[in-house]
Amino acid sequence: MAKKSVIARNEKRKALVEKYAAKRDQLKKAGDYEALSKLPRDSASCRVRTRCVLTGRGRGVYEKFGLCRQMFRKLALEGKLPGIKKASW
């Protein structure tokens, strides 16, 4: 489980990205890089980390499911992910 402060910081960054998305696109199209650099750093989408929705883990996350590899495996084996089954051949 990731620290709550790390998860909260990432949520704050997501909110800033959403807040400044339109302004950022407008400045990029205009080519006003000086004004773009004056926006908050955390409003850039590259600062947001994809995290597991259950544990907050930041590595090994499947974006399609929003789960880290451990939780994905656990839930898939329990049959809680519809349409997912273990491969065998």
From Swiss-Prot:
GO cellular component term, pick one: cytoplasm
Family matches, as Gene3D superfamilies: 30s Ribosomal Protein S14, Chain N
Signal peptide bounds: none
Pfam families in the cross-refs: Ribosomal_S14
Superkingdom field: Bacteria
Keyword annotations: Ribonucleoprotein, Ribosomal protein, RNA-binding, rRNA-binding
Keyword Hydrolase in record: no
UniProt keyword Ligase, yes or no: no
An annotated Gene Ontology molecular function: structural constituent of ribosome
One GO term of the biological process aspect: translation
Subunit structure: Part of the 30S ribosomal subunit. Contacts proteins S3 and S10.
Its job: Binds 16S rRNA, required for the assembly of 30S particles and may also be responsible for determining the conformation of the 16S rRNA at the A site.
Family of this protein: Belongs to the universal ribosomal protein uS14 family.
Name the record gives this protein: Small ribosomal subunit protein uS14
Biological source species: Chlorobium phaeobacteroides (strain BS1)
Gene, per the UniProt record: rpsN
